Amino acid sequence: MAKRNVKGLYYITHVNNLHSILQYGILSHQQVEKQNIPYTHIYNPEIVANREARKTSDGYSLWAYANVYFQPRNPMLYKVISETDKNEVVIVGISPQALDIKDAFISLGNAASPLSPILEVDKGLELITGEYWSIINSDWWKTEDGTKRKIMAECLVPNVIPPRYIHSIYVTNQTTADKIRPILNNFTLPVAIVVEPHMFFQPRKHGPITHQLFWVDGDMFFSQMQTLTISVNTVGVMGKGLASRAKYQFPDMYVVYQDVCRAKTLKIGKPHLYKRETSLDEDLADVPSSLPNLNANKWFLLFPTKEHWKQKSDIGGIERGLQWVVNNYETEGIQSLAVPALGCGLGGLNWKDIGPMMCRYLSGLDIQVAIYLPQEQEIDPEFLTRKFLLGE
């Protein structure tokens, strides 16, 4: 059965609700009110109200169903941790056996949206593990192609998902794990506490190099830095790696990139800064209009590491590009900067060579700079030290 591909279901909630969830299970909104259970809300009232109006084929409102996600790292979680201290948010891991609960449904996307079909479980699973699978397992989404809605696909269970289906609690850091451990000690069934910062859009690991410069193991496209650096060639092709993701996630940036390549103004040693005028929250958060403060506009630094996409990265050209950053970041208005390990991965360069060179230049900037480690290489901790990277 297709269900074998579904490793778990997930419920996003406030840490204050854990005690009642472990006691009563994950309740529908209707049951929370009916049983008068104290509950700390993390969802916008407008979102909750929208769900009341939509009904399943059984004639019941979505309020009558406990709803869990197939993918918790989604626009709703992004919105929640934009409004709530991430240390107060937990994700409850549910066994996929909950899909067998009688009269459950699957919504192919955010169930509140009329664009999301609500289907019986067998048909819904066939689609979730088929054409929707790559969307469910994606690291990003867009409004235009529907992936922002579809990645929030839900399993809808009448009234309650009993506590026996709970197998894990995911948290963003060890502090939250320590906070909830006493709660779980009183729960008779075994439940694992899993520290998984990536699930909460946080770096897996990070460490200081100087007071302004640090290395990060994580997803650069969720960085809080104002400007994101994209490694590119100068012939207008974004085929693989970070550039390929940027091309599809930010098509307006790709248009600008092609324009500067055609105009031959993008050259080795001369990056191009695209000052985008759209907040990343608008792209990533569910119902971004209700966020109290949208984050600042995200800029892109198109940084050539080679001339042709078939070539290996040009370390001399990268060094000239870094010098350009040093000379121009203040006048261009760059306030903080995220940079991948330039030329590593598909470019063929090694962190042992490029890391120290990047740090020599970027450590002199009077702004915060995050260097994102190459995902294609395992970096030994000794090559992440200040002594190795700066010779100090």
Model-derived features with residue positions:
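Macrodomain-like recognition of ADP-ribose-binding/processing modules
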Residues: 2, 89, 186-392
